[in-house]
Amino acid sequence: MVQIIFDSKTGNVQRFVNKTGFQQIRKVDEMDHVDTPFVLVTYTTNFGQVPASTQSFLEKYAHLLLGVAASGNKVWGDNFAKSADTISRQYQVPILHKFELSGTSKDVELFTQEVERVVTKSSAKMDPVK
């Protein structure tokens, strides 16, 4: 099963990932070493920026990144969850979901489906049918 690695400032992202049911959930600042593919869930800071802690983590481990999801607040308009756009563009990975604050049950369902899809797609690339 895939690792979900998250970054959370106010607790919204942590509450979201805890609702997903995934077994391997770790926080960015608790990771000493990463050697398996992962999905990143982060927040958006300031005016649509990627948090420095997330960026620092990705500088080391982006080669294992399968996809990204981000939290935000819709009052920020075009900057809502914009960190996902930046990470997706910078590291050429799909945006799995954008959710407001700590997300709804529908957000959790959509995110879980997208994680399963990207993991299946990634596994097929790593283990092609002979």
From Swiss-Prot:
One of its GO terms (molecular function) is FMN binding. InterPro entries: Flavoprotein-like_sf, RNR_Ib_NrdI_bac, RNR_NrdI. It comes from the Bacteria. GO terms for biological process: protein modification process. Gene3D superfamilies: 3.40.50.360. Pfam families: Flavodoxin_NdrI. Coiled coil: none annotated. Induction: Part of the probable nrdI(ymaA)-nrdE-nrdF-ymaB operon. Expression is constitutive but low, dramatically induced by thymidine starvation which requires recA. NCBIfam families: nrdI. HAMAP family: NrdI. Probably involved in ribonucleotide reductase function. Belongs to the NrdI family. This is Protein NrdI. It comes from Bacillus subtilis (strain 168).
